[in-house]
Curated annotation (Swiss-Prot):
Region of interest (G3), residue spans: 81-84
Name of the molecule in the record: Elongation factor Tu 2
Gene3D superfamilies: P-loop containing nucleotide triphosphate hydrolases, Translation factors
Region (G5): 174-176
EC code(s) of this entry: 3.6.5.3
Nucleus keyword on record: no
Length: 394
């Protein structure tokens, strides 16, 4: 049996289910796989195989996640589903599963519950750009007005967190009904798939974004000048391009006079490639690890931001004790550690291992950052937390 060839013809989109415990996220995941396999072809997955999610380790954090795939005529989807609430929190904060869009599952029998709100807030903080709502268990509610009421509540809750609650798609269905092959509910799964296709725009590929490369190493090559090396995070670097050196010190600009990979000279380096870039007129001591090379004007250095943070539990190798205000760990961005001060939300005195928390961070030196940038919190080289930049202040 030969392995099936992965056809790169359709656009690839990453999605996932979010929402309160027992509202039917995993059942819906199984229903999407099964219904779309039936209608458009592909592999069906049953509830048990998805629910029995394998443990993964992302930056030392243990996360249970199920990955499934399905196709619509227009696209290929990779979909993540997590068994427990804590797994969602970790997944969203570490960016282990980057989502281009989320499917918020709300049981019509319960309406929005505490984790519904928490997942919406997390989605806002970590930058999930689009949310589609699947109101589940609608076969258990006879009252039309009650369904309308729940839909209204969910829309209002999403608007509260700056999602377009009035305009985003809400599909009323039954995941279990669809799994059991009932046609009226299978039709709702197809409707959900169509909403995914039309409401979530095709994500921009890394190569189409403005150029950025974190600097890992700096060398000076006699007679040629200074070479910085790193893995290009996004965009393309062409010989002759003007580039900015951003972070830690004042931003400067220079010209890239050469790109090399494995000692071979290239015309350009692309997202995902490890390259060395030769910089015109830049001295060895003017650049350092932790800065980035970027398209001028595309990214700016900052010191103060709001973040959403997950603090590793003792079992994950994190701290054994809580920390308090006045805590000054290192924040590891891309390739380097920078010390920072934290301030905790009002009324929060201490943070326990295993908690997730919003905190404002002020770094001692500026780092090139955008909202959505992930970082680790470290003490003497040991990772004790993971976070994401939610909002930049200065």
């Amino acid at each position: 049996m030969s392995k099936e060839k992965f056809e790169r013809v359709k656009p690839h989109v990453n999605v996932g289910t979010i929402g309160h415990v027992d509202h039917g996220k995993t059942t819906l995941t199984a229903a999407i796989c099964t219904t779309l396999a039936k209608v458009y072809g592909g592999a069906a997955r049953d509830f048990a195989s998805i629910d029995n999610a394998p443990e993964e380790r992302e930056r030392g954090i243990t996360i249970s996640t199920s990955h499934v795939e399905y196709d619509t005529p227009a696209r290929h989807y990779a979909h993540v589903d997590c068994p427990g609430h804590a797994d969602y929190v970790k997944n969203m904060i570490t960016g282990a599963a980057q989502m281009d869009g989320g499917i918020l599952v709300v049981a019509a029998t319960d309406g929005p519950m505490p984790q519904t709100r928490e997942h919406i807030l997390l989605g806002r903080q970590v930058g999930i750009p689009y949310i589609i709502v699947f109101m589940n268990k609608c076969d258990m509610v006879d009252d039309e007005e009650l369904l309308e009421l729940v839909e209204m509540e969910v829309r209002e809750l999403l608007s509260e967190y700056d999602f377009p609650g009035d305009d985003l798609p809400v599909i009323q269905g039954s995941a279990l009904g669809a799994l059991n092959g009932e046609e009226q509910w299978e039709a709702k799964i197809i409707e959900l798939a169509e909403a995914l296709d039309t409401y979530i725009p095709e994500p921009e590929r890394a190569i189409d974004l403005p150029f950025l490369m974190p600097i890992e190493d700096v060398f000076s090559i006699q007679g040629r000048g200074t070479v910085v090396t790193g893995r290009i995070e996004r965009g393309i670097l062409k010989v002759g391009d003007e580039v900015a050196i951003v972070g830690i010190k004042d931003t400067t600009t220079t010209t890239c006079t050469g790109v090399e990979m494995f000692r071979k000279l290239l015309d350009e380096g692309r997202a995902g490639e490890n390259v060395g870039a030769l910089l015109r007129g830049t001295k060895r001591d003017e650049v350092e690890r932790g800065q980035v090379l970027a398209k001028p004007g595309s990214i700016t250095p900052h010191t103060k931001f709001e973040s959403e943070v997950y603090v590793l539990s003792k079992d994950e190798g994190g701290r054994h004790t809580p920390f308090f205000k006045g805590y000054r760990p290192q924040f590891y961005f891309r390739t380097t550690d920078v010390t920072g001060d934290i301030s905790l939300p009002e009324g929060v005195e201490m943070v326990m291992p295993g908690d997730n928390i919003q905190m404002v961070v002020e770094l001692i030196s500026p780092i090139a950052m955008d909202e959505g940038l992930r970082f680790a919190i470290r003490e003497g080289g040991r990772t004790v937390g993971a976070g994401v930049v939610a909002k930049i202040f200065e």
